[in-house]
């Protein structure tokens, strides 16, 4: 932890500004034009990164929360300066080329956080976000900049299904709490409630305490913290996309997290919360029991309890104050005891086999029992468009494994979600009759017999590139296997004759992204 806090009580300018600007008078003269007072000269400057815009419905209330954050900062002796950041809405990209841009924007957001913080010498940061890519994006930036920081998630929308379930947005807000970078109960409090506004106010006050004590993200985002977050993720059955986002945040924090870590921790972490889309329960119901702190209290025997959090206390100290309201459970599967879980292992499963030598992911907590083992002929599509066209016309058969390739992080490029294909199968009543497999990914709002993130992807020469319609694919979720029933020699023969397809995009951001991005199960980030 840093010893030179730069707070007003030190009687000197904030440390970042003083170290970077011998001519601080010039800098402060510009801040005076922003409306600061002369008495603010010795106060820490806190950057308030707000991903508000009029496009993303989950971000509409962030302006109000930012005002609460700045009020908290000011009441604790600091100055909060708000700035904007790009933030996409995944829904606008569904089943069209716009989805190629959604995941890459996560890294653009992380870069924006870094660029603004370093260019303007903030003493600390509060980062407000609500949605799928902006949440991990600002967390990546927070980890990279490594100044006293707090993440404020937007919370859940009352009676709004996309918000009350463990889609990617809410999964990442829950995992921010599990990592220790968000105040307890922020994720599961209703977005526009007085309680959520109060949590935003507290975040503004607490970031000043972090500045005073010199507590930075690297004190919090340790390997032990990431292992805690993975266990919470398995216990709640979070989004597929957490396999991409947690390793990316870890990379920016200087910690290596792999798909094998998810696999190892899933084996010893029970699935405790049957929350949508996997099950009938909702996040607001989990909040009645105690939210993510209650989940972590149940998991306490499996967690690293001495990790630091943004409360300024360890996880152990935080959990000592948590009471689980078991009698308030509206449904027994909202949260189950450790010795009586929904299932004995985690709600996400890493599959491997000759079809996915480096791995693939299924949300096992949302798979029907009769689909845990499945074998059928492949029906191969070389793009999402081809698959969507066929599925919309019901041009497939029960018992098939529908396989979509060339939609990976390089091939897409940008790894667009294949969610509309999955949702169409669900509406057609086929979730107990077919499997969908892809080197692309899915929305966190998806569940069922959907396998994604097949790695290596097709355009990088993974075996998925040479599967032919009619080849038999065997899936065994219990044994964590996915295989095409072909001799190794035949797979190698096909691969030796295979040539990668021409890039779909040759200029602009996506072209640069495809050339530089690391594989999805390593985090899909720009190094």
Regions found by a protein language model. Give the residues of each.
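Catalytic or ion-coupling anion/metal-binding cores of large enzyme and transporter domains
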Residues: 2-58, 65-86, 91, 97-102, ...
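A short, small-residue-rich loop immediately preceding and capping a beta-strand
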Residues: 117-138, 150-154
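Short, well-structured alpha-helical segments in soluble
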Residues: 108-120
């Amino acid at each position: 932890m840093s010893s030179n806090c730069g707070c007003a009580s030190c009687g000197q300018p904030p440390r970042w500004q003083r170290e970077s600007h011998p001519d601080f008078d010039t800098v402060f003269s510009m801040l005076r034009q922003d409306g600061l007072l002369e008495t603010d000269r010795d106060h820490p400057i806190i950057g308030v990164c707000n991903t508000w815009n009029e496009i993303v419905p989950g971000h509409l209330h962030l302006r109000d929360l930012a005002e609460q954050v700045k009020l908290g900062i000011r009441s604790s002796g600091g100055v909060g300066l708000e700035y904007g950041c790009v933030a996409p809405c995944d829904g606008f990209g569904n089943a069209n080329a716009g989805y190629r841009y959604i995941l890459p924007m996560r890294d653009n957001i992380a870069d924006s956080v870094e660029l603004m913080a370093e260019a303007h010498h903030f003493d600390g940061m509060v980062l407000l976000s609500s949605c799928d890519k902006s949440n991990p994006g600002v967390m990546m930036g927070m980890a990279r900049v490594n100044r006293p920081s707090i993440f404020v998630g937007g919370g859940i929308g009352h009676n709004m299904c996309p918000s009350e379930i463990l889609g990617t947005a809410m999964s990442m807000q829950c995992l921010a709490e599990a990592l220790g970078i968000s105040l307890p109960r922020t994720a599961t409090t209703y977005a526009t409630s007085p309680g959520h506004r109060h949590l935003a106010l507290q975040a503004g006050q607490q970031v000043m305490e972090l500045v005073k004590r010199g507590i930075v993200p690297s004190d919090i985002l340790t390997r032990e913290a990431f292992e805690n977050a993975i266990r919470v993720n398995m216990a709640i059955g979070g989004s597929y996309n957490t396999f991409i986002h947690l390793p990316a945040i870890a990379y920016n924090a200087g910690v290596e997290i792999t798909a094998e870590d998810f696999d190892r921790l899933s084996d010893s972490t029970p699935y405790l919360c049957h929350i949508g889309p996997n099950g009938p329960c909702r996040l607001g119901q989990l909040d009645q029991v105690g939210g993510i702190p209650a989940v972590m209290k149940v998991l306490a025997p499996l967690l690293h309890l001495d990790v630091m959090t943004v409360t300024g206390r360890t996880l152990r100290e935080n959990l000592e104050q948590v009471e689980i309201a078991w009698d308030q459970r509206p449904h027994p599967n909202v949260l189950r005891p450790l010795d009586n879980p929904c299932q004995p292992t985690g709600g996400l499963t890493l599959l491997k086999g000759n079809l996915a030598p480096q791995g693939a992911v299924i949300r096992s907590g949302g798979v029907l029992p009769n689909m845990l083992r499945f074998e059928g002929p492949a029906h191969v599509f070389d793009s999402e468009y081809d698959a969507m066209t066929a599925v919309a016309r019901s041009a497939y058969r029960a018992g098939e494994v529908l396989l979509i390739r060339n939609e990976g992080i390089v091939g897409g490029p940008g790894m667009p979600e294949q969610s509309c294909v999955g949702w169409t199968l669900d509406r057609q009543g086929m979730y107990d009759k077919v499997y969908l497999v892809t080197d692309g990914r899915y929305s966190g709002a998806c569940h069922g017999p959907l396998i994604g993130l097949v790695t290596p992807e097709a355009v990088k020469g993974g075996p998925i590139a040479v599967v032919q319609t009619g080849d038999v694919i065997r899936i065994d979720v219990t044994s964590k296997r996915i295989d095409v029933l072909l001799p190794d020699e035949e797979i190698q023969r096909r691969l030796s004759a295979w040539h990668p397809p021409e890039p779909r995009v040759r200029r602009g951001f996506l072209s640069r992204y495809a050339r530089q991005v690391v594989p999805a199960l390593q985090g899909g980030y720009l190094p």
